[in-house]
């Protein structure tokens, strides 16, 4: 989660009364982690759905949920209601490493006949480097927004310069030029798109199941289109995390996962677009919420003369969470309802389009994306009005 999602809402004003000394005392303890009953239930679900892969990912996330490092304190965040582990992204990465080692030793696991240590796309390298930038914040070594921006821009610029194939080169055909100026422009557009989506994904990691649900739909779609085992494996890890995150709220993606997965989504998007498997409109539809929300935030803040990196609690998922919190007693349930509902509306139209083989129909996808934009703006307007009315009633 970015600092933008870490402000305390008015409806949870009581947390403001927690003194700094109290927070320091609490920080010496680890998070509560998953209980025995939760682990047993999840073992039945994940074991039944995913077999040994589900149980492996569950073991990793249970272990991380009990560790003292990388903890997100509920006393410091508006949407979080309990101390949670920020190591969800790390657990998914370790799951991928375990699967990679397993298939290298036993190639039959992946349907191969001989060992092969190469696995996954080459742009895993820059995605991993970008994930490490976010990992510093997970460990309590935060970087300033400007420093993060400079580091991510540098990593992507160097990567695209060294390996131009990582960029969406099919844009040359759309634009109709291959000169040096076009190549420089493509580099700038590629870096800007990746940096923008990394920030969008980091912002969206603010409600249970929101970002992970979008990631899951994206990589399932990528696997459906390419039949690449890597995308299938990462989908398994994401499905395990999604269920654990939504049902318990005890572990979140963290900046390692948000940065790494956002970068990977952007780079995979470039790749499948270059292969002619999807259109730009389909990608916009599939990733609609983080893209629309980050653009809305920047436009609103710049229009007000404020820094676009300033932390506040005016994201649509924060406002919708406050609305659900007034409907249900369980704060974890309200959090999960927020994330799952937004993620479902963001990805389901694209999934339906994909199954109908319309992912190259730019007019259809553009129309659907336009409707999604209108709905997201409407939801933000309604929930913001509800928050203002609720605050007025509270202050009387």
Locate the predicted segments by residue.
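Membrane-interface starts of transmembrane alpha-helices
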Residues: 83, 144-147, 181-182, 254, ...
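Cytosolic, membrane-interface loops and tails of multi-pass inner-membrane proteins
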Residues: 60-85, 295-333
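Structural signal for the N-terminal portions of transmembrane helices
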Residues: 276-286, 350-351, 361-368
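Alpha-helical transmembrane segments and their immediate juxtamembrane interface regions
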Residues: 126-141, 358-396
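"…together with the soluble PPM/PP2C metallo-phosphatase catalytic core" -> "…together
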Residues: 14, 19, 23-292
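Alpha-helical transmembrane segments and their membrane-interface junctions
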Residues: 95-104, 337-358
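N-terminal acidic, proline/glycine-rich, low-complexity intrinsically disordered segments
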Residues: 1-15
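Membrane-helix cytosolic exit motif
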Residues: 292-304, 378-387
């Amino acid at each position: 989660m970015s600092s933008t999602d870490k402000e305390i809402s008015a409806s949870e004003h009581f947390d403001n009364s927690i003194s700094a000394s109290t927070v320091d005392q609490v920080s010496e303890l680890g998070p509560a982690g998953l209980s025995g009953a939760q682990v047993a239930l999840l073992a039945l679900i994940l074991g039944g759905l995913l077999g040994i892969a589900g149980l492996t990912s569950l073991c990793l996330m249970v272990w991380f949920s009990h560790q003292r490092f990388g903890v997100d304190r509920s006393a410091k965040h508006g949407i979080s209601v309990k101390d949670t582990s920020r190591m969800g992204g790390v657990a998914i990465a370790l799951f991928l490493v375990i699967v990679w080692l397993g298939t290298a030793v036993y190639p039959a696991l992946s349907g191969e006949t001989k060992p092969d240590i190469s696995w996954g796309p080459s742009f895993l390298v820059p995605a991993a480097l970008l994930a490490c930038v976010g990992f510093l914040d997970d460990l309590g070594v935060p970087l300033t927004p400007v420093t993060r921006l400079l580091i991510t821009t540098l990593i992507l610029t160097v990567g695209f310069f060294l390996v131009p194939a990582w960029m969406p080169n099919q844009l040359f055909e759309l634009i109709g030029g291959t000169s040096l100026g076009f190549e420089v422009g493509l580099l700038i557009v590629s870096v800007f798109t990746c940096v923008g989506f990394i920030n969008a994904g980091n912002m969206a990691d603010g409600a249970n199941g929101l970002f992970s649900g979008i990631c899951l739909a994206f990589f399932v779609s990528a696997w459906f289109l390419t039949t690449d085992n890597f995308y299938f494996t990462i989908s398994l890890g994401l499905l395990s995390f999604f269920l654990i995150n939504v049902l318990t709220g005890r572990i979140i993606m963290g900046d390692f996962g948000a940065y790494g997965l956002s970068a990977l989504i952007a780079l995979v998007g470039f790749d499948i677009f270059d292969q002619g498997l999807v259109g730009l409109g389909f990608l916009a539809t599939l990733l609609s919420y983080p893209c629309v929300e980050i653009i809305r935030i920047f436009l609103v803040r710049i229009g007000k003369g404020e820094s676009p990196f300033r932390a506040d609690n005016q994201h649509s998922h924060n406002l919708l969470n406050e609305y659900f919190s007034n409907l249900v007693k369980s704060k974890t349930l309200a959090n999960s309802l927020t994330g799952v509902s937004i993620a479902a509306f963001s990805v389901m139209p694209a999934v339906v389009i994909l199954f109908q083989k319309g992912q190259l129909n730019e007019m259809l996808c553009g129309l659907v994306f336009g409707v999604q934009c209108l709905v997201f703006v409407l939801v933000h307007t309604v929930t913001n009005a509800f928050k203002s009315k609720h605050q007025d009633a509270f202050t009387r």
